[in-house]
Amino acid sequence: MTSETRTLYSQLPAIDRLLHDSAFLSLRDRYGHTQVVDLLRRMLDDARDVIRNTQTLPDWYADWAQEAKLRLENAAQSALRPVINLTGTVLHTNLGRALQAQEAIEAVTQAMRAPVTLEYDLDGAGRGHRDRALATLLCRITGAEDACIVNNNAAAVLLMLAATASGKEVVVSRGELVEIGGAFRIPDVMRQAGCTLHEVGTTNRTHAKDYRQAVNENTGLLMKVHTSNYSIEGFTKTVEEAELAEIGRELDIPVVADLGSGSLVDLSQYGLPKEPMPQQLIAAGVSLVSFSGDKLLGGPQAGIIVGKKAMIAQLQSHPLKRALRADKMTLAALEATLRLYLHPEALAEKLPTLRLLTRSEASIREQAQRLQARLAARYGDEFALEVKPCLSQIGSGSLPVDRLPSAAMTFTPHDGRGSRLEALAARWRMLPVPVIGRIYDGRLWLDMRCLEDESRFMEMMLK
């Protein structure tokens, strides 16, 4: 160690002296003695590293209290930070998928603040069932005999298979052996559920005779899986759910379906692409139908299974059901969301997912043009700002080939350097409320479809 290094080390303050500084007294009151002391020890270690590597004191040496304050504030931030989603993906899996309706938010708040009748029957003063209220609503909306709620649709598929076909074969078209995010594959789920996969047909063509020929004495289920996150086009043939249900009735084999996204309304009435609905499959005779709560339905993360009462009873009594059951906050939000579907005339206004998906290109473009001048005054020295047409996507594996006409504010660096776009995107991610866009074709795009809180957006962008 050189004499210069020793001199620099000697200038580092003692923790006890720092703790008696008035600024640190304030930090101790706010964050607690232990957190502040632990932080100061880390800061001293950091300072020693800087001295050892650079033979200089750290940049923040002159104001330890300010550096400590910044670090403590950063550490205190929630891991689930609110962001402004301008990626162009409405149901963005990495950003939490569906925004909740105000009614759902209020229902969750109430469920957290007070004891609730989660499994308590007020009429009989005894134990109730946590799925009962939602089952009643879901039966009213879908026409099913009964319903079951778990924590996500992957869990719903696992429970459906394990409870009704463990030790048996499940017949599925080869073209429907889907994989979703996180390497969740239908064949893997079947193995976990104790089922044997029996593939029929080919990737692009499966016929009714393929299902008939596959049935044997060990067949437990015929299964349809909606390919919600990809599309096979061209020379194709599939067996529709109604036809498969008829085959199931003839052969006395239950038919189950995994819809994935799942929509409880006909989206085409809003000018959106049509998606199969659970009520259609129930009417067609499918025994069990599973779908997600936090995708096109617009509620919290949940797996929903509707169908025949006897088969739902098998699910409810299976040991996996308790491991996969939804908590009171999920059930409260889902019930409030489902009640919105009882008033379909107001659904597009009250349900954020539907409200964002149905925004017109003209209204989005007008919004972008209205904000352009103020943003140009802030960023115009480095970037050319333009309002350009773009295509939003629904996201979360829903309607993968369909796009929604939209408008974006684009930022193009005057000097053409892509590094400026990366730096700008990084700067926006560091804002108190991060703004998330996407870089494409030499521009940074902010798709304005999901922008509802303009004042907060402009406050962040003009910092």
From Swiss-Prot:
Keyword Protein biosynthesis: yes
Keyword Nucleus carried by entry: no
EC nos: 2.9.1.1
GO biological process, one term: selenocysteine incorporation
Reactions it catalyzes: L-seryl-tRNA(Sec) + selenophosphate + H(+) = L-selenocysteinyl-tRNA(Sec) + phosphate
Pfam families, per the entry: Se-cys_synth_N, SelA
N6-(pyridoxal phosphate)lysine: residues carrying this PTM: K295
Cellular component GO terms held in the UniProt record: cytoplasm
Localization annotation: Cytoplasm
Record-linked Gene3D superfamilies: 3.90.1150.180, Type I PLP-dependent aspartate aminotransferase-like (Major domain) (3.40.640.10)
Gene Ontology molecular function terms on file: L-seryl-tRNA(Sec) selenium transferase activity
Pathway info: Aminoacyl-tRNA biosynthesis; selenocysteinyl-tRNA(Sec) biosynthesis; selenocysteinyl-tRNA(Sec) from L-seryl-tRNA(Sec) (bacterial route): step 1/1
Cofactors named for this entry: pyridoxal 5'-phosphate
Sorted UniProt keywords: Cytoplasm, Protein biosynthesis, Pyridoxal phosphate, Selenium, Transferase
Entry function: Converts seryl-tRNA(Sec) to selenocysteinyl-tRNA(Sec) required for selenoprotein biosynthesis.
UniProt similarity note: Belongs to the SelA family.
Subunit structure: Homodecamer; pentamer of dimers. Binds only one seryl-tRNA(Sec) per dimer.
PANTHER family (UniProt xref): L-SERYL-TRNA(SEC) SELENIUM TRANSFERASE
Annotated protein name in UniProt: L-seryl-tRNA(Sec) selenium transferase
Organism: Salmonella typhimurium (strain LT2 / SGSC1412 / ATCC 700720)
Gene: selA
